[in-house]
């Protein structure tokens, strides 16, 4: 069984970061070692929260503890998401290096959460620069949304073709796989949710219907998406099939959340369809 060290945020109430991704990843049949970068009462889109950012040294201490019992060699991938400070980022990269020393075949999957003030996603100063300058070249896989893709590349992206080109430019700087996990205004269709999966040689596009939640969209969709893609790839799924499963599984969670009249992702209620989605979508090679 594969093992993932998941270094992300944690909320006590609701679903974001590890609280959104950990259970679905486990449900897909992998072990998850959750290491929390922050512990908040709830996610920041509520506009009010309590809790704390973990000291950067806490991350290193925990990873060293696993090394001390000689189990880092069993780690197949490190997944990082929301970080509370750029100092945490440096410690995460040190942890990645330590894992790869113990297991040279281990992957680093970076979800570069850079903040989106309009959506209430707030990150500390210096975090975006950390992702652009340090995490990108260290990653094997990276999963930006459109805004983050533009920040990582320093280029404006207006359409799918440009998104593919810019994603390939990121591949030249480090990662082998780039998931653009929300094309937004650069997509083909205004009424669809679209994603791209890009490598140096291939590009796959997929779309699904939007799920309308009104003015306030659920948080944690990107965390769920990244976690499920990593699981699929670790299990050896081809890129297109991995993208298809992730798209369908996340859509099922969104539908269940809407059906239940909830705002927080209903990952437990949707667990069966995360594993075996009812809806199906086809990835198209570009």
Curated annotation (Swiss-Prot):
The protein's annotated catalytic reaction(s) are: pyridoxal + ATP = pyridoxal 5'-phosphate + ADP + H(+)
Fetch the CDD domains from UniProt: pyridoxal_pyridoxamine_kinase (cd01173)
Binding annotation for substrate: 9, 44-45, 223
Pathway, per record: Cofactor metabolism; pyridoxal 5'-phosphate salvage; pyridoxal 5'-phosphate from pyridoxal: step 1/1
- GO cellular component labels: cytosol
Per the UniProt entry, the Enzyme Commission number(s) are: 2.7.1.35
Which Pfam families does the annotation name?
Answer: Phos_pyr_kin
Cofactors, names only? Mg(2+)
Name the NCBIfam families on file.
PRK05756.1, pyridox_kin
Assembly and interactions? Homodimer.
Species source reads Yersinia pestis
Q: What does this protein do?
A: Pyridoxal kinase involved in the salvage pathway of pyridoxal 5'-phosphate (PLP). Catalyzes the phosphorylation of pyridoxal to PLP.
Binding-site list for ATP: 111, 143, 148, 181, 208-211
Q: What is this protein called?
A: Pyridoxal kinase PdxY
């Amino acid at each position: 069984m594969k093992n993932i060290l998941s270094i992300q945020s944690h909320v006590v109430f609701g679903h974001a970061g590890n609280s959104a991704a950990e259970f679905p990843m486990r449900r897909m049949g992998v072990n998850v070692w959750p290491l929390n970068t922050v512990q908040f009462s709830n996610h920041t889109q509520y506009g009010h929260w309590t809790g704390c950012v973990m000291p950067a040294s806490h991350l290193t201490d925990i990873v060293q503890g696993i090394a001390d019992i000689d189990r880092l060699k069993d780690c197949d991938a490190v997944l990082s998401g929301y970080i509370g400070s750029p100092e945490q980022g440096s410690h995460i990269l040190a942890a990645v290096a330590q894992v790869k020393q113990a297991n040279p075949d281990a992957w680093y999957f970076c979800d570069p959460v850079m903040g989106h003030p309009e959506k209430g996603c707030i990150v500390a100063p210096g975090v975006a620069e950390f992702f652009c300058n340090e995490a990108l070249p260290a990653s094997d896989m990276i999963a930006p949304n459109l805004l983050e893709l533009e920040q990582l590349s320093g280029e404006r992206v207006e359409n799918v073709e440009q998104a593919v080109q810019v994603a390939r430019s990121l591949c030249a700087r480090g990662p082998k796989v780039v998931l653009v996990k929300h094309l937004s205004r650069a997509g083909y269709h205004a009424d669809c949710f679209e994603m791209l999966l890009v490598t140096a040689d291939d590009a796959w596009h997929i779309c699904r219907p939007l799920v309308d939640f009104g003015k306030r969209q659920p948080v944690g969709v990107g965390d769920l998406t990244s976690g499920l893609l990593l699981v699929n790839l670790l299990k050896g799924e081809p890129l297109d099939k991995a993208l298809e499963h992730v798209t369908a599984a996340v859509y099922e969670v969104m539908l269940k959340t809407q059906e239940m009249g909830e705002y927080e992702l209903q990952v437990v209620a949707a667990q069966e369809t995360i594993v075996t989605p009812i809806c199906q979508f086809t990835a198209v090679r570009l």
